[in-house]
Every structure is written in C-alpha cells, then in structure tokens.
Amino acid sequence: MSETQNTQTKRQRTLVGKVVSNKMDKTVVVLVERRVKHPIYGKIVMRSAKYKAHDESNQYNEGDTVEIAEGRPISRSKSWNVVRLVEAVRII
C-alpha cells in the first residue's frame, strides 16, 4: 500500500488570470475570474479573486494573461508562482 502512495504524485493547483499590478518587486497581482451558478436564483454570475504571485525576473506587465501555480509560502501573502505567459497585452 505504501508503494502506490509513493508512486502517485499530488497534482498542483493551477489558475489562469490577468495581471492587474506589477508595481512590487518580483511580485505580480493576478485577478482570476470564475463563473458560478447563484444558489437561489440560478443565474450565472462572475466571482473573482486576487492572488499575489512570485515573478522572479519582473517580466510580466499589466494586462498580460498568465498561468499561476500554487507552491510553498514565499511571504505572508504570497504562495503562488507564475508558470508561463498565456497571452501578452497588445500595446496600441
């Protein structure tokens, strides 16, 4: 039984969201929106949450769509890491 537990790895939580702030050093704030059905009225409503994610090279800008993954706590409010850039913001 212990062999099967060792071979199975825990899946890492990943989310996709939009960078809303990159003013902190090595940190971006990512807004993640999800659609939920209202429990009483049945209407689909948008729920959102902001996550602080670690950006080691300060390469992501406001408006970029990024994928973040949960990791070990880096600070009091930061326990997510930016994995990859999904879509860059278009500057006109």
From Swiss-Prot:
PROSITE patterns: RIBOSOMAL_S17 (PS00056). GO terms for biological process: translation. Gene3D superfamilies: Nucleic acid-binding proteins (2.40.50.140). It holds the Pfam family Ribosomal_S17. It comes from the Bacteria. One of its GO terms (molecular function) is structural constituent of ribosome. Disulfide bonds: none annotated. Keywords: Ribonucleoprotein, Ribosomal protein, RNA-binding, rRNA-binding. InterPro entries: NA-bd_OB-fold (IPR012340), Ribosomal_uS17 (IPR000266), Ribosomal_uS17_bact/chlr (IPR019984), Ribosomal_uS17_CS (IPR019979). SUPFAM superfamilies: Nucleic acid-binding proteins. GO terms for cellular component: cytosolic small ribosomal subunit. NCBIfam families: PRK05610.1, uS17_bact. One of the primary rRNA binding proteins, it binds specifically to the 5'-end of 16S ribosomal RNA. Part of the 30S ribosomal subunit. Belongs to the universal ribosomal protein uS17 family. This is Small ribosomal subunit protein uS17. It comes from Bordetella petrii (strain ATCC BAA-461 / DSM 12804 / CCUG 43448).
